[in-house]
A protein has these predicted regions:
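Alpha/beta catalytic cores of group-transfer enzymes, especially the acyltransferase/condensing modules
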Residues: 19-168
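Glycine-rich nucleophile elbow surrounding the catalytic serine of serine-hydrolase chemistry
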Residues: 8-17, 21-22
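Flexible, low-complexity segments
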Residues: 1, 164-203
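Conserved residues at the C-terminal ends of beta-strands
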Residues: 8, 109, 190
Length: 203
C-alpha cells in the first residue's frame, strides 16, 4: 500500500487520481482546461522558461533580488537545477548575469509560455472556477503539494494548494525532503521517462 503520493507540475493531477482524491474523468477535464488556459493567457512566444544548472534555488533567488531581474523561479527541481520563467527579453538579459555569478549552464527551454509564474495569474483565476465545480474526495493516503511542499490528506488543504499551483513555484526539492520525513524506503516513478528519478537522486 502506498504511503504518500506526489507529482511534478501536471503530474500532481495524476497523483490526485492515484490517491483517489479525484476521478480520472474530472481530472481530464481540469487538465484539458489547464492546458488551454496556460497557452491562451498570454501572447505566444513573448514569454518562456530556462533551466539553470549548477546552483540551488536559494542562490538563484539571491541573484534575482540583487540584480533586480524580472524573472522568477518556476521549478526548484534539485539543488543543482532550477528553472526560471519570464518574458523572453528578460530571460535573455538575465543569462550573462547568471553566468557571471557562477552558473554552469543556462538552457532556454522549448516552451510556449512562462509557466508557474505570475504571468499565469489570470489563467490561474479562471482555472479556480473550474476546480470549484469538481467533486473531490477525502483519502487516508496523503499527498505532498507542489505549492508549499506540505503533506496533506485534508481535502480542503489539497484543493487550496491545487488552486495556487499554476502561477507559483514547483517546490520539488522541498517536496522530496518532506518525503524523507515519512521514512519512505522505495519511490516508484510512473510516467514516460525517468526524469524525476534522476532529480530525486540529486537531492
Amino acid at each position: 500500500k502506498p504511503k504518500v503520493f506526489l507529482g511534478h507540475s501536471l503530474g500532481e493531477y495524476s497523483a490526485l487520481v492515484a490517491g483517489n482524491f479525484i476521478n480520472i474523468t474530472d481530472a481530464s477535464i481540469l487538465i484539458k482546461k489547464r492546458g488551454e488556459l496556460m497557452h491562451s493567457s498570454i501572447e505566444p512566444n513573448i514569454s518562456g522558461m530556462a533551466a539553470i544548472i549548477g546552483k540551488n534555488a536559494k542562490f538563484i533567488d539571491g541573484v534575482i533580488k540583487k540584480n533586480n531581474l524580472k524573472v522568477v523561479i518556476a521549478n526548484d527541481n534539485s539543488p543543482m537545477q532550477v528553472v526560471i520563467s519570464g518574458l523572453i527579453e528578460d530571460i535573455i538579459s538575465s543569462e550573462q548575469i547568471f553566468f557571471k555569478n557562477g552558473v554552469k549552464r543556462f538552457v532556454k527551454l522549448n516552451v510556449s509560455a512562462a509557466f508557474h509564474s505570475n504571468l499565469m495569474n489570470d489563467a490561474q483565476l479562471e482555472l479556480i472556477n473550474e476546480i470549484n465545480k469538481i467533486n473531490f474526495k477525502n483519502c487516508n493516503i496523503p499527498i505532498i503539494s507542489n505549492y508549499d511542499s506540505t503533506i496533506n490528506s485534508n481535502i480542503e488543504s489539497i484543493i487550496y494548494s491545487l488552486k495556487n499551483q499554476m502561477a507559483n513555484r514547483v517546490r520539488w526539492t522541498d517536496s522530496i525532503k518532506k518525503l524523507e520525513e515519512t521514512e519512505t524506503t522505495q519511490i516508484i516513478e510512473i510516467g514516460p521517462g525517468k526524469v524525476l528519478s534522476g532529480l530525486i537522486a540529486r537531492i
